[in-house]
């Protein structure tokens, strides 16, 4: 196990998470609402979120929210996919919202430039006001925070929640917006109470050479963020992500003793689908971890699961890496260390 002061590890964002979420709720969400006000004035009827990595997964979650509770046309597209296969419809009734923490992601900047050239409303969500991405967008929000999963998810959710509220009010959307007020306290509780369990699960998972992550519903994008982005980039663990409903259509054939699985189990309508996969796997291997939103939700809406489930996964992945004697901040290639 790596001997390290966790307060020095940039990967671990639990320390200031609550304060950052409180700040975004009070200061930055109203700025999102102002952008949505302009979108409504311009009769925007199509939204393209463009991002890469974890920011893309946050945007995908917001896209699923829109699909579930509205007829809004919302898309979440990887940067180069947007640039290489630019949507046929890109005009003055579209919005292109680029999400990039450092604001230097080449393809996201290019996507905003493409959108602006076609007359689309453009906005950028990034950490600093002087990020390069801000010059490519008509509007920008610099959130000044490090817990990017929570922040990006909150900003993208706020776009969708406000658009639905203004254009086609929905009772469930009202419940989600109301429960967001309780998010800081709920996150704080998990930060304080989940470290030891996360350590135990991380130690267990560190013994596995790779992990299959399985999720459904609003947790699908978080499943990718944790099972691919986090495991591969930060813990150097091989990973694969499977959508719960697709598990029986091929992937079930690799289940056997010793094969490791991580399940993210929500309490939305897709719960039974993931439970079916869990039951099948548990009959055939003991290497199973289940993170269950029903146990940590604190009564919050099922579509807030991606916010809360992040905390157990943050602790699990941190300790997984530490038990593998790997500092999650260490890189071999990423961030310009090697030409790509």
From Swiss-Prot:
Signal peptide: none annotated. Residues 35-169, 201-331 form the SIS domain. GO terms for biological process: fructose 6-phosphate metabolic process; protein N-linked glycosylation; UDP-N-acetylglucosamine metabolic process. It holds the Pfam family SIS. The keyword Coiled coil does not apply. It is an enzyme of class 3 (hydrolase). GO terms for molecular function: carbohydrate derivative binding; glutamine-fructose-6-phosphate transaminase (isomerizing) activity; hydro-lyase activity; hydrolase activity; identical protein binding. Its EC number is 3.5.-.-. Induction: Induced by fructoselysine and psicoselysine. Makes part of the frl operon with FrlA, FrlC, FrlD and FrlR. Pathway: Carbohydrate metabolism; fructoselysine degradation; D-glucose 6-phosphate and lysine from fructoselysine: step 2/2. Disruption phenotype: Cells lacking this gene are unable to grow on fructoselysine or psicoselysine, where they do grow on glucose. Gene3D superfamilies: Glucose-6-phosphate isomerase like protein, domain 1. Strongly inhibited by ZnCl(2). It catalyses: N(6)-(6-phospho-D-fructosyl)-L-lysine + H2O = D-glucose 6-phosphate + L-lysine. Keywords: Hydrolase, Repeat. The keyword Cytoplasm does not apply. Catalyzes the reversible conversion of fructoselysine 6-phosphate to glucose 6-phosphate and lysine. Functions in a fructoselysine degradation pathway that allows E.coli to grow on fructoselysine or psicoselysine. Homododecamer. This is Fructoselysine 6-phosphate deglycase. The gene is frlB.
């Amino acid at each position: 196990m790596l001997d390290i002061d966790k307060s020095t590890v940039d990967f671990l964002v639990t320390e200031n998470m609550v304060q950052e979420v409180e700040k975004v709720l009070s200061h930055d969400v109203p700025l999102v609402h102002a952008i949505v006000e302009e979108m409504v004035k311009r009769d925007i009827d199509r939204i393209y979120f463009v991002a890469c990595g974890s920011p893309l997964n946050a945007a995908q979650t917001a896209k699923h929210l829109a699909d579930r509770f509205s007829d809004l046309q919302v898309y979440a597209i990887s940067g180069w996919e947007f640039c290489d296969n630019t949507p046929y419809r890109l005009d003055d009734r579209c919005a292109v919202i680029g999400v990039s923490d450092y604001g230097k992601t080449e393809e996201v900047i290019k996507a905003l430039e493409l959108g602006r050239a076609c007359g689309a409303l453009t906005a950028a969500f990034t950490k600093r006001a002087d990020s390069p991405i801000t010059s490519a967008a008509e509007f920008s929000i610099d959130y000044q925070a490090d817990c990017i999963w929570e922040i990006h998810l909150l900003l993208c959710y706020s776009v969708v929640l406000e658009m639905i509220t203004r254009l086609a009010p929905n009772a469930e959307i009202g419940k989600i917006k109301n429960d967001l007020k309780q998010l800081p306290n709920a996150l704080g509780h998990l930060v304080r109470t989940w470290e030891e369990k996360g350590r135990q699960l991380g130690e267990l998972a560190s013994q596995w050479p790779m992990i299959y992550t399985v999720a459904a519903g609003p947790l699908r994008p978080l499943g990718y963020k944790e099972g691919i982005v986090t495991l591969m980039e930060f813990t150097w663990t091989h990973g694969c992500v499977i959508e719960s409903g697709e598990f029986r259509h091929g992937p079930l054939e690799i289940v056997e003793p010793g094969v490791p699985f991580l399940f993210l189990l929500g309490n939305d309508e897709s719960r039974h689908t993931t439970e079916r996969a869990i039951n099948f796997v548990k009959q055939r291997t003991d290497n199973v971890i289940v993170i269950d939103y029903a146990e940590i939700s604190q009564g919050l809406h099922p579509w807030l699961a991606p916010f809360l489930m992040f905390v157990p996964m943050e602790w699990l992945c941190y300790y997984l890496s530490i038990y593998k004697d790997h500092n999650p901040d260490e890189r071999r290639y990423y961030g310009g260390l090697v030409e790509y």
